[in-house]
Curated annotation (Swiss-Prot):
Purpose: DEAD-box RNA helicase-like protein required for pre-18S rRNA processing, specifically at sites A0, A1, and A2.
Gene that encodes the chain: utp25
Keywords: Nucleus, Ribonucleoprotein, Ribosome biogenesis, rRNA processing
Record region (Disordered): 1-165
PANTHER family to which the protein is assigned, alphabetical: ORF PROTEIN-RELATED, U3 SMALL NUCLEOLAR RNA-ASSOCIATED PROTEIN 25 HOMOLOG
Compositionally biased intervals (Basic and acidic residues): 110-130
InterPro entries linked to this entry: P-loop_NTPase, UTP25, UTP25_C, UTP25_NTPase-like
Subcellular location: Nucleus, Nucleolus
GO MF annotations, alphabetized: rRNA binding; U3 snoRNA binding
Name of this chain's protein: U3 small nucleolar RNA-associated protein 25
Subunit structure, as described in the record: Component of the ribosomal small subunit (SSU) processome composed of at least 40 protein subunits and snoRNA U3.
GO biological process, one term: maturation of SSU-rRNA from tricistronic rRNA transcript (SSU-rRNA, 5.8S rRNA, LSU-rRNA)
Polar residues biased stretches: 85-98
Basic residues composition-biased segments: 1-10
Length: 729
């Protein structure tokens, strides 16, 4: 759980945080008092939480009352027919026919206890209960606004089709024979890899479907947006916002605009804004080309009514771009990027959007690391979903999904409407025609619940269960042939690569235009540790032959090779004893296992310990930290997710044991620097000499190890046959 915030702290927060713990939602109870703590009862007394415990209809998670829309509590059809309420009066002024019908639908959805409120302005703020229904209420796409603008579009938006435009070659005018060939190669897992070095110490792995060894070449790097095939409307603004691409961004821009799948594992707070602008430009370019093509063909068909013209320019449903983000503030940043590029004359419901999604940064977090503020700054609520619709001059926020061009959502927010308990209400057809899927800040999503991301990816580009007003005569053939997943472009940005994200690359990136993995060369987090003294760091490798057995073998190694020495040193006297030992445990399940062992095993009888996990109460966290700093606790168990959400500076640390390496290399540096938090220890030469770090790893920790010790060292440490212990000073 992240530190409390002024906004965005809804009841869904805990529901999105990774695998469910096998016990109660709160761990570490009274852990600071004794080694025989009550936490064992906590684990044994409750079954595993339901994965969707806490899912409600409340969307924004705010405690603030809805002020801009009257919510009618209706108990009968007669009450629903009433038209004298202020809400209906306002709607009648705007649009007496269509909007009143919509209001009636909304009242039927709102009868579960909603309270009336006064109307304050024209931007009607929907209730949180209504929002979940509204995004799917109208399941037929509306072309009326687009058709009304067809003549206007001809004046400035009509552009000649460019055969060299990747939009034409990959989306609009696919070669069916070549597409069939590449799809078959992908199904047969026939990929050819091209590797190369990129600027800024990155390396590229470019995979292409190629079963016959044909000639392929990687897209050339681009230095400015002038080299991109953009809509005329976007050209000048793109040049202002993205005047040039430097370093690895030149290659990323080229791959993105050529519709290749991209996994970029070098996202940082410093390059996040440029990546966001680049992806916003690409998304807008794709949406505008798609919609303008439809509008132009609508006008053509209306003029040439006597000709038998076949037009294939659509998918099953309207949404074409899906953006998965970790927080509402991240959504605000992405939408702001879209808005500044598009420059609409009007933005409908923007005030409501900013009220519900934006929040100022917490001033008390000024000392927090940049990556922490980048993820949790502003409104860090992880339960949201919103649709954007584009017309020639307007961006419409909160458009219903089947009338939206771009959908932005958190994994939890999207899954709650896709996976309802009532099977009749389950719906994912709005994802059937997604052509660009963007997953930003994937490493942040890992600390929520990655299963939601996998679930969404599994439901992309499936054949729809209903027609939703689709004109099948205009659906592109590769949709009808169930090949959309091979055309869809997937773009994933992450700060580091993990097995889960790598699995996404392997299983869900199946693009006929190829897929690229851009990885950094690491010098190692151990080279970035800032301590005024030299600390001995020991890495111990244990043999693990099978991934599923890795947790058991790790636990066995810890209890037989590390814990006995720790138990002896804790009872010892002098500077070299084991008091002040922090045990960092990445997995919550491993944390529970180790905690229970400390509480029940005779081997740990004389060890006083505390435990801090992501589920520990705030008061218990503070108490455990205080007692550990004062020496009343010899050992403190600490999880990676607790550090992710809190970023504590823990005092009193003299020895560090990494039960497993952290996913985030920044965490390794921060944890090791705990050794420099106690001036009293650093002042004494004997005390400083006894500070040490020990880390345990196996071959399945290859990604983690590379980030911590460096790319070259990691390879040697994993392959070394002369020994399993490696020391760094």
């Amino acid at each position: 759980m992240a530190p409390p915030r002024k906004r965005g702290r809804g009841s869904f927060r805990g529901s999105s945080r990774g695998a469910r713990k096998p016990g109660n939602a709160r761990g570490g109870r009274n852990s600071f008092q004794t080694s025989r703590i009550d936490e064992k009862r906590e684990i044994e007394s409750s079954d595993e939480e339901n994965q969707f415990n806490g899912f409600e209809d409340d969307v924004s998670g705010d405690d603030e009352p809805v002020q801009d829309e009257e919510i009618v509590d209706s108990s009968s059809e007669d009450e629903e027919a009433t038209t004298e309420r202020p809400y209906n009066s306002l709607l009648q002024l705007l649009n007496a026919n269509s909007e009143t019908k919509h209001a009636r639908k909304r009242r039927k959805l709102d009868r579960a206890g909603s309270k009336s409120q006064d109307i304050r302005d024209v931007e009607i703020q929907a209730s949180k209960e209504v929002e979940e229904q509204d995004v799917l209420e109208n399941q037929e796409a509306s072309e009326e606004e687009d058709n009304a603008e067809a003549d206007k579009a001809g004046e400035s938006e009509d552009e000649d089709e460019d055969a060299s435009d990747p939009f034409e070659t990959h989306i609009a005018s696919l070669d069916e024979a070549e597409t069939t060939k590449r799809v078959n190669e992908i199904k047969s897992d026939k990929w050819r890899s091209i590797k190369s070095s990129l600027p800024e110490n990155f390396r590229l792995i470019y995979n292409i479907p190629d079963g016959e060894g044909g000639s392929w070449s990687m897209p050339s790097a681009v230095k400015t947006t002038r080299s991109l095939k953009l809509k005329k409307k976007l050209v000048s603004r793109a040049a202002e916002i993205l005047p040039s691409f430097e370093g690895v961004a030149q290659n990323i821009a080229s791959l993105v605009f050529n519709y290749s799948d991209v996994l970029f594992a070098g996202r940082t707070p410093s390059n996040a804004a440029q990546m966001r602008d680049l992806l916003s430009l690409h998304s807008l370019n794709h949406v505008l080309k798609t919609r303008d093509r439809v509008i132009k063909n609508n006008a053509r068909l209306s003029r040439d009514t006597n000709e038998d013209i076949e037009v294939r320019d659509q998918g099953f449903t309207r949404p074409k771009v899906l953006v998965i983000l970790p927080t509402r503030q991240a959504c605000v940043r992405f939408v702001e990027s879209i808005s500044k590029i598009y420059q609409p004359e009007q933005q409908e419901n923007r005030k409501r959007f900013m009220d519900e999604y934006h929040a100022e940064d917490n001033e008390s977090w000024a000392s927090k690391p940049d990556d922490f503020r980048d993820l949790f700054g502003g409104n860090d609520d992880d339960m949201f979903r919103i649709g954007l619709k584009f017309t020639r001059k307007t961006i419409k926020y909160y458009s219903q999904f089947y009338n939206s061009d771009i959908i932005l959502a958190s994994p939890l927010g999207l899954r709650t409407i896709m996976d309802k308990e009532d099977e009749k209400k389950r719906d994912h057809d709005f994802l059937s025609s997604i052509e660009i899927a963007i997953v930003d800040h994937s490493d942040g999503l890992l600390m929520q619940n990655w299963e939601h991301v996998e679930y969404i990816c599994e439901h992309l580009n499936l054949q729809p269960k209903e027609a939703h007003g689709c004109d099948f005569s205009r659906v592109r053939t590769w949709y009808l042939d169930d090949r959309a997943r091979y055309i869809r472009q997937t773009i994933v940005l992450t700060s580091f690569l993990t097995p889960e994200i790598n699995s996404l690359f392997s299983q869900h990136m199946q693009n006929i235009a190829g897929k690229s993995k851009i990885l950094p060369q690491y010098n190692g987090a151990i080279t970035e540790v800032a301590l005024p003294i030299t600390v001995k760091q020991t890495f111990s490798r244990f043999d693990s032959t099978f991934a599923l057995k890795d947790p058991d073998l790790r636990f066995k190694y810890f209890t037989t090779a590390i814990l006995p020495a720790l138990a002896r040193s804790v009872t010892g006297k002098g500077e070299g004893n084991g008091a002040g030992t922090l045990i960092f445990i990445p997995s919550y399940l491993d944390f529970v296992r180790v905690r229970n062992f400390f509480a029940t095993s005779s081997q740990a009888t004389n060890i006083s310990f505390g435990a801090i996990s992501e589920y520990t109460e705030q008061s218990e966290m503070s108490r455990a930290r205080s007692h550990f700093m004062n020496g009343r606790l010899s050992v403190l168990l600490y999880t990676e997710r607790a550090h992710h959400f809190r970023r504590y500076n823990i005092r009193g640390v003299k020895h560090i044991i990494f039960y497993g390496l952290p996913e985030n290399p920044i965490f390794f540096r921060e944890i090791v620097q705990y050794l420099g938090q106690d001036p009293g220890v650093l002042a004494g030469t004997a005390g400083a000499e006894n500070l040490d770090v020990r880390a345990v790893f196996s071959k399945y920790d290859a990604f983690k190890l590379e980030r911590i010790v460096g790319t070259q060292r990691a390879g040697n440490m994993l392959k070394e046959k002369g020994g399993d212990t490696f020391r760094f000073v």
